[in-house]
Each structure stands twice: as structure tokens, then as C-alpha cells.
């Protein structure tokens, strides 16, 4: 775990909640997650849940993924997905819109592990450097990822070698993010 990355994640999450509360006078609201149990749920409100991020008591374990792909995941990947439960959060980075992907529940974490494993297997087959996605963009094939070799946060075009460095570290990336509520 990298403490700076964890602090930056928790700080961004709180900035997101604060921005939402200022804009909407409530905790963040999500209709898609209404029937899914999560420690993030603060209140059910009709067809939606009001939520806030929830730090994990114990970091999530990525041994299954690492064993399955025979690759040690970068510590920032483990911190990003292992430090808290949260709904996905919309944000901007240098004016570009994105959705920061998060883990809502333990079941969601199981699905994430399968997706990461599939992503890494595909990259290995295509002889690409390993990355792990952390955010979605409006462009269907462009994702924001952590390079597993360097820890750089990059914008990558899936299935290609097209990669642009956005930040040297996860902490730097998260510190530059602006909540979009």
C-alpha cells in the first residue's frame, strides 16, 4: 500500500461527497445500485440509495489475480481498488470527463478481479505492457489505467500500444481530479 495514494483517494472521495452535497443538498445518489447491499449505503430513498465512500477495515486481497496471471500487481492498483468501498464517481482531469471506477461490495470486488484477469490475459496475448484500468472515458475504447510496470497513470486505447502519460503516480492523478456532480 502506498500511503500517499490512499490519502489522495480518500481525499478525492470526500471532495466528491462535499461537491455533491453542495450542489444537491444530499449525499450522492445512485439509482443503479438501489438493490445491492453495500457498506456505502447511508439511506434508501425511493428508487435510489444515498451513499458515501467507506474505508475498508482490511485491504482487499488480490492474490487470486496475481496467482492467476503470474504477475504481481502494482501497489497503486491494490491501493486504488483495495482501500475503500464506493460507487463510481464522475470527475474531470484537465477538462476531460471520466468515471472513476470503484468497488461497491465484496461481490463487486469478485467481478472486478475477473475483469482485471481477463484484461491482463488479453494484453499478454497481444504482447502489450500490462495495465489495470481505473477509469472509463466517453470514448468507448479509451480507458485510464495504471501501468503495472511504472505506476504511471495513462490514457490508453484498448488493444493497441497507444498510451499517453497523464500523471507519474496515482496520487498525482487523484490530486488533480475535479469532482463532476
From Swiss-Prot:
* InterPro entries linked: Syd, Syd_sf
Q: Which Gene3D superfamilies match?
A: Syd protein
Q: List the disulfide bonds.
A: none
- The answer, when asked if Cell inner membrane is one of the entry's keywords, is yes
What Pfam families has UniProt attached to this entry? Syd
As for membrane topology, the entry says:
Peripheral membrane protein
**Per UniProt, which keywords does this protein have?**
Cell inner membrane, Cell membrane, Membrane
Naming one, the record's GO cellular component terms include:
cytoplasmic side of plasma membrane
Organism's domain of life? Bacteria
Where located? Cell inner membrane
**What family does the entry list?**
Belongs to the Syd family.
Function of the protein: Interacts with the SecY protein in vivo. May bind preferentially to an uncomplexed state of SecY, thus functioning either as a chelating agent for excess SecY in the cell or as a regulatory factor that negatively controls the translocase function.
Q: Identify the NCBIfam families for this entry.
A: PRK04968.1
**Annotated protein name in UniProt:** Protein Syd
* Lineage, uppermost ranks: Bacteria, Pseudomonadati, Pseudomonadota, Gammaproteobacteria, Vibrionales
Amino acid at each position: 500500500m502506498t500511503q500517499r495514494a490512499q490519502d489522495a483517494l480518500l481525499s478525492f472521495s470526500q471532495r466528491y461527497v462535499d461537491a455533491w452535497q453542495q450542489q444537491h443538498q444530499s449525499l450522492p445518489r445512485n439509482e443503479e445500485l438501489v438493490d445491492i447491499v453495500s457498506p456505502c449505503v447511508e439511506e434508501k430513498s425511493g428508487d435510489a440509495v444515498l451513499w458515501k465512500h467507506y474505508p475498508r477495515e482490511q485491504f482487499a486481497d488480490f492474490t487470486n489475480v496475481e496467482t492467476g496471471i503470474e504477475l504481481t500487481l502494482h501497489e497503486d492498483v491494490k491501493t486504488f481498488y483495495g482501500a475503500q468501498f464506493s460507487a463510481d464517481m464522475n470527475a474531470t482531469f484537465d477538462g476531460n470527463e471520466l468515471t472513476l471506477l470503484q468497488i461497491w461490495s465484496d461481490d463487486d470486488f469478485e467481478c472486478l478481479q475477473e475483469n482485471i484477469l481477463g484484461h491482463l490475459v488479453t494484453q499478454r496475448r497481444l504482447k502489450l505492457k500490462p495495465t489495470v484500468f481505473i477509469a472509463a472515458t466517453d470514448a468507448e475504447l479509451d480507458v485510464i489505467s495504471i501501468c503495472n510496470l511504472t505506476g504511471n497513470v495513462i490514457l490508453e486505447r484498448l488493444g493497441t500500444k497507444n498510451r499517453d502519460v497523464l500523471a507519474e503516480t496515482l496520487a498525482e492523478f487523484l490530486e488533480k481530479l475535479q469532482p463532476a456532480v
